[in-house]
Every structure is written in C-alpha cells, then in structure tokens.
Amino acid sequence: KRDEDGIVLVDQDRCHGYRFCVEACPYKKVYFDPLRQVSTKCIFCLPRIEEGVAPACARQCPGRLRLVGYLDDEAGPIWKLVHKYRVALPLHPEFELGPNVFYVMPMSPPKLDAQGRPTDEPRIPTSYLVSLFGERVPEVLATLEAERAKRRSGEPSELMDLLIAYDWNQNFALGPRKREVL
C-alpha cells in the first residue's frame, strides 16, 4: 500500500507466481495472470492518478456510481458520505484493514409476490448486506430511505444531491494526498 495515495500494488518484479497473495487477499481482488505467470490486481489506473485524472472506471461510469476524493476533505463528497451522513461503509469492516474503498448500500425496489404485488421484503436481503458491510447496514438503509422520502415530498436533501451527482466533475478530487474511493 503506497503511503502517498493508499493504492495497493503487487510488485511484479518480486512476484514468483506462487499465488499466496491470491489466497490471502481478504477482498478477493488479486488474481493470477496465467500469461505472465504473476499475481496482479487493479492498479486504480495509477498513471492517470499521477496526472490528476480520474480512474477510467470512475470517469466512464454511466451511472456516476464512483466518486474519488479525500477522506479528510470535509467539503468533499467522500467525507460527507462517510462521516457526516454515515451512509458509506467499508467492505468487511471486521477485517479492520483501513480500506480505501467505501460503499453506499443499494436501494432496490421491494420483492414482488406471486401475483406481482410489492411486498415488505427487500429484494437484496438485509442479512446478506450485513454479512458484507457489518452491523450498521440497517441504520444506513433507514437513513437513505428517510432522505429519499424527504426528496419525494419536495424537501431538499444534500445527501440525495451527493448521490445523484448532477455535476459529475465534483465526484473527482485528485492530488498527492491520500484518497478514498466510493
């Protein structure tokens, strides 16, 4: 993990292809490249980051689902989603690895019964989300639903504005400091 930006890299020159890192990665993001005979992973478009350009996945995402910024920038969207609204969670917080990636729970429509009517049951089971993101999931889902209800009733919601991302340029704040991704 690089100190200057938090990006985790696999040293291709030192890798012997034993695949221990593939097995050890708690996030299951390292894979074995059979052509080069080394383990590898996403490098977060490091050459782009070094030029101050957003990673390709974030820049090209049609749903504007990826935000890139600094966790300590109180004016930025990452800080607000993680600290102010507390709706962005790390994957597997029980590992206590200080991840650079945070997730906002998906708000899916309810399940439908056999007759096609909506039920009170979520399409993605809450228990499954808890297994991925920890015990705060129900609290996060309640916050998201309350903010969505505010917006539906015509009230303003900074949280919904952040998640809708009308101005996608505000989703990217890059530079030489540590960055977090959502």
Language-model-derived ranges and their functions:
Residues 1-59, 71-73:
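Ferredoxin-like iron-sulfur electron-transfer modules
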Residues 56-182:
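Long, compositionally biased charged/polar accessory segments in the mid-to-C-terminal portions
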